[in-house]
């Protein structure tokens, strides 16, 4: 379908940006992989809390990975294991992997005035809200710090590199060097989250 859109609409391929949430994260990865095998590299894929169960720590052909596009950025917002009702993947799967609030449980999701259903999916869906806010806000940029762990980040042991810290969301840019680094940031518990 993407090939048809490219050929029939005159879309500017360099501006193509695929976005997937949960299981859809892996579907856009499959699309990117399929197009790459046909000689077309998708410029950017953003994945919002990619599904963890049945995908995490599996072969890269079965899930999103950095080879699926020129730039793959990932927001991990619900990385608890399925045993404790987490839906997202903790494993790094992109060029930039962002872990707001450590990636486990999002601020504001512990409120008692939400239904059980809302409680169960609150952290998982929060990645969508963060991404949407990164598009609509003119003053908020989710600056994230490279760090070995969330604990080190909270202890203030992480600094921005000389070129500055990357931002999470729509304005994310592919890093100049490919390193396996996690990026941490804090958010607010209510909208605006930044």
At which residue positions do the language-model features occur?
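Non-catalytic, well-ordered alpha-helical segments in soluble enzyme domains
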Residues: 120-141
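Serine-dependent carboxylesterase/thioesterase catalytic core
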Residues: 1-116, 125-127, 151-163, 172
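Short, flexible loop/turn segments with low-complexity composition
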Residues: 142-151
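Generic structural motif recognizing short loop/turn segments at the entrances and edges of beta-strands
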Residues: 92-96, 141, 178-183
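Extracellular secreted precursors and ectodomains with disulfide-bonded cysteine-rich loops/domains
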Residues: 107, 120, 138, 145, ...
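Generic structural signal for residues positioned in beta-strands
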Residues: 71, 97, 146, 182-184
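C-terminal helix/juxtamembrane-tail motif
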Residues: 166-194
């Amino acid at each position: 379908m993407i090939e048809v859109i490219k050929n029939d609409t005159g879309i500017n391929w360099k501006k193509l940006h695929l976005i997937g949430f949960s299981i859809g994260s892996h579907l856009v990865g499959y699309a990117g992989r399929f197009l790459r095998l046909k000689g077309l590299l998708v410029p950017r894929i953003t994945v919002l809390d990619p599904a963890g169960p049945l995908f995490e720590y599996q072969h890269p052909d079965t899930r999103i990975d950095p080879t699926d596009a020129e730039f793959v950025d990932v927001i991990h917002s619900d990385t608890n294991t399925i045993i404790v009702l987490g839906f997202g993947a903790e494993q790094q799967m992109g060029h930039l992997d962002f872990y707001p609030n450590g990636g486990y449980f999002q601020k504001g999701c512990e409120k008692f005035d939400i239904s059980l259903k809302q409680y169960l999916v609150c952290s998982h869906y929060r990645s969508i809200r963060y991404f949407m806010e990164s598009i609509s806000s003119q003053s908020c940029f989710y600056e994230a710090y490279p760090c070995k762990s969330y604990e080190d980040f909270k202890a203030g042991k992480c600094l921005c590199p000389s070129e500055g810290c990357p931002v999470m969301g729509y304005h994310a840019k592919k890093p100049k060097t490919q390193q396996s680094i996690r990026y941490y940031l804090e958010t607010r518990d209510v909208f605006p989250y930044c």
